[in-house]
Structure formats: C-alpha cells, structure tokens
Amino acid sequence: MILVFGGTTEGRKTVAELEEAGNPFFYSTKQGEQNIALQHGIPLCGAMPENDMIAFCRSHSIRLIIDAAHPFAAHLHHTIARVSRQLHLPVIRYERIYPPRNPAIQWVADYDEAIRMLTDKNKPAKRVLSTCGVQSISRLQPLKQRGIQLWFRILPRQSSRVLAYEQGACDDELCYYPSPSDTERSTTEDDVALFERLQPDVVLVKESGESGGFEEKTRAALSLGIRVMAIKRPVMPEGFLTVDGEHGLRRMVEHILPEFYPLHSGLTTGTCATAAALAACFRLLKDECPKTVPVILPNGETIPVDVLYHDDGASVIKDSGDDPDVTNGLEIQASVSHTGDAQHENIIIKGGKGVGTITLPGFDSPVGESAINRVPREMIRDNILAHFPDAHLVVTISIPQGEEIARRTFNPRLGIVGGISVVGVSGIIKPFSKAGFLDSIKKCMQVAKASGCDRVVINSGAKSERFVKGYYPALPSQVFVEYGNYIGDTIRMASELHFPQVTLGVMLGKAVKLAAGNLDTHSKKTVMDKSFVLDMLREVPCDDTVIRQAEQITLARELWKIIPESQLQRFAEVVIKHCYHYCAPLLPKGQLTILLIDEEGNIYHS
C-alpha cells in the first residue's frame, strides 16, 4: 500500500495519478477540508504524530510514502523522514516547481530573520501585509508589539478564521484570498486591488513555488513599488526521492512498486531525442558524460533519462513502457556541432538517417523538412538553452533503424518518407491511452484535410480500408483514416475540420454496437447486444427460423450466413439507419455516408 500526505495542489495531482492504477492507497490531510474525489483512495484526516505514523505503516503494510504536503510543513517532512529511516520505507517527495530567486526580492531564512529585518532601525517597516498563511499570525505578533500595522491574508474558510482568532488576529487585520469559484478576475488583479487598498510598505511572502501563486503575488507588489520580503523554503530531509510533476511521480512509483500500475508508462521519441541531444552537449561543451540527464517536459517538470555515449555524440534506447509501440527499443542518436556563426539561430535542428522527410502539407513543419514535430523541437531547444544559454549549435537526430520501422507505422500514408517521425506532446507515453490514439487519428485527419479533398473516408483498420479504397478508387490514400474503435470522436474531428462529406466504412461487428448507440466500440467498453440485434432482424422482417438461429450466434459476422441473400440489402439498410441515427448529429454541417462491409468485401449502403 501507498500512504500519501497531501492537502495541496500536489496532493490533488498525486491522487489523480494514483487513481489511474485502479489500486487502493491512503490519502492523509491534516484538516480534511480539501474537496477531492477519491475512487480507490482511502481518506485519512488529522495530524499523525511519529508513533502513530509508525503504527499505521506497520498495521497497513505501507511500502511507499509520498510526501505531497506543503513545502513549509517542515515538522511533517522530518517526521516522515524519521519514520522512513526506522521502517526502511522509500519516500517520494512531490516538490513544487520554483522560479529562480528574484534579486529584487529581499530573501530571509525564517520568521526570526524577517522580524529582525522589518524592525531594523535603518529601514523599519510601518505597514506589513503577510500572505504567509494563518500559521504565521502568532509568529509575527512581535511586530504588532512594536507598533507595526499588520494584515494577514488567509483562506476564506471557517477553520482558518477560528485559528486566526486563536492566534491573536482581529477582523480588521484579516483579508482573504479569492474564493475558488471566483473566476471573474485573475489572481494578479486581486492582489493589485488589495495592495492598493491597504498600501503596505512591505509584503511578506513564503517561497511557495508556482502552484502557490508566488510569482503572481510578488510581481503585483513589485509593480506597485512595494518592498517584498520572502521567506526561503525549508530544506527537505536527506534521502527523499524528489519529483516535480505527475509524470515523474508515476515513473518513480512504477520503479519502486512495479506491480502498483498494471501497465507502465514510456517515453516519446521527442523526449528520447531531447535527452540524447542534451547529453551530446554535455560531452561537447563540458567534457562530461553523465549517465542520466535532466529533461524538462512540456509541462515544466523535470525527469531523469538514461543516456549512452558513442563517438559522434549520445543516444537513448527508447522505452515505450507497455504501450504497443513499434519504436520500442530503438536507439535514438544525437550529434552536435558548433554553427561557427553567431548570426545563425541559436539551435539548428536537423534530421539524420532514419528520420523521415515531410512530403505532404498538413504538418507543423513545411514540406521538405525533417519529420521532427514542433513540441520535440521546442524541447530540444529549450533544454539545451537551459544549460547552455549562449550556445550556437547544430543538432542532428538520427535513428539507425528508422527507415525499416517506418514501414510499420502511419508514416507512408501521411507522406513521410525515409524514416519515422520524432513526436510527442506531453513527452510521456501513457500505455494504451485513448488520448494517444486520438492524437494519431487527429494528425491523419489534418493531413486528409490538407490534401484538398472534400471527402474523408474513415474505417476501422486495414481490412475494411482495402475494401473502401476499392469503392473510392480515385481518392488519394491520405483521405482514408483509421478510427480503431473511436467512431464518435473521429466524426467529431471531421466536423471540427469542416469536411463537407464523410464516409464511414464499418464492418458488422462494430456496426451492431454502433447501431445500439455505442460510439466507442471497443470490446472493453461494450459487447454485442443480442436482444437489439434480434429486434433489428424482426424489423427487416426475418422469419422465426432466422431469429432462432441468430439467438445462438457468438459473433455478429455469423449473421451474413444466417440471413437469406434476398434480405441482406434490407438488413443492411436497417443497421445503417440505426447507425445514422447516432452518428449524423455529430456532423451537423456535413453529409454522412455509411457503408456496411461484409467479410468478402461486399459493400452495402442505404
């Protein structure tokens, strides 16, 4: 079991990530006031002293602790560390992402130093607004005793008000953060309005990171010429395994408890190319060859990626996790060289052997460019410049087996020749994810649109596509798009891309599910509704002999052999009518044609 300490934005993200595993875990908060939906998580409420934590971990067979608590919950962090050492439990620290420390801000180590600085006779404060939370009220009372006007900004909940009163605050000294439901104004605008009303000469903040609104508060204060003093975040205990995002969290859990997630995540080709490029830069520019490099993902978090080195640069062996990806195990290489001309773009990215070339429009790079998508290009450039801001380099990405593997991908159909694409949006592959499959469908639909054809022909796979291509012999190959099981989503994409004509080619197994209103026909989502099939047969109408035979079928395709040939066209019309009922509303401004295909490739239409 996993024990999570949360109550924060990071705690909420931890829950979302762990819930995907479908396995139970414990989620502990001090106050129990966080509004969070738990399906497999088991909520715990209240402080957990060291001895209680030890007893709980032992009695519930805890094998991993995730510390996603507030960075300033120092007592809890050190309690977790002591329990971890005593029970030999690994701890993952879900840390926040912190911006670089702004030199325009006055940085202090703790409240004691803050009080000394605020009462310094050379630069004394007169009016101080603390945004450090309700727990800061008692700590800052010495300022009030010295005649300094204090205000405290706290959360708008009853427990915070009660605690504020207990610590000596009065109503005139309290102001509140916007309610979570207040979406009319940005946080910065609310900060500005508050600062202008109170006119403090100092705003006291904690280094709470991006999710704590640190930059918004400090930017607003500095823009008004207000002095900002920030308390540095406490140093975490040694031994914690630190992540700063949901992807890194999942991969760390997969590493420590491999059985928790039934399926493991992987890395996109874009992330692998980025890691290889960054490693090659370390070798060229610093004469260093680290075994892992820190890769910043598009969401801002950083994950470690293992790298290898060779004569021309560095490489990464692609790990696709449990995703059925033909690129799994490929070596993705990067070599770097100096541009020799500071007038060039800082980082020039090229495709080498095994990286495809774009030959058709519809991509985020022009025809003739290497098939390295926009997000991977940005990742490569941003990661290199994060470490080497003055670098002027040419980066060449190569995939030695890319040309061979490309034959087993969508690339030939998309007009990408000579190799595979370097792709990725999040940088991480979620195994068998619907999002990943829909993204590939969307790319195919965009290429189909860029072809200039008015019609897109969507089909379930290679078999049905072969038959519908025979039905539309004059159409180019790129307008034939596989939907897998996501019929509804694919039609919606066609509508969003303003296709005037859409043809849906469907075989009977999926058609009977679709006719019953199931727009996702995956066997995990739905099975054939035999009673509905029998109702459609009666609608034909078929006689009782056919009905009795149909009652015994296992697969829908058996119906082709049961229904008399003279009634097949009418049966097809009934099935298509019901499919059309559910699909047509998804294409309100286009014309939908549905083709029902039998096992021999005969095509029926209404």
What are these regions (language model features)?
Residues 41-57, 176-190:
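Glycine-rich, highly charged phosphate/nucleotide-binding loops
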Residues 165-173, 177-224, 229-233:
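A C-terminal functional module that forms or caps the active site or interfaces directly
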Residues 27-36, 94-98, 134-136, 154-160, ...:
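Short, polar loop motifs at secondary-structure junctions
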Residues 260-408, 412:
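Generic N-terminal targeting/processing segments that precede catalytic cores or assembly contacts
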Residues 26-48, 103-105, 161-167, 303-306:
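N-terminal beta-loop-helix "entrance" segment that forms/cooperates
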Residues 264-267, 414-420, 425-572, 581-582, ...:
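A structural signal for small-residue-enriched, beta-sheet-centric alpha/beta enzyme cores
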Residues 64-114:
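Glycine/small-residue-rich loop that forms an oxyanion/phosphate-binding "nest" at active or ligand-binding sites
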Residues 133-177, 188:
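Anionic-ligand binding region
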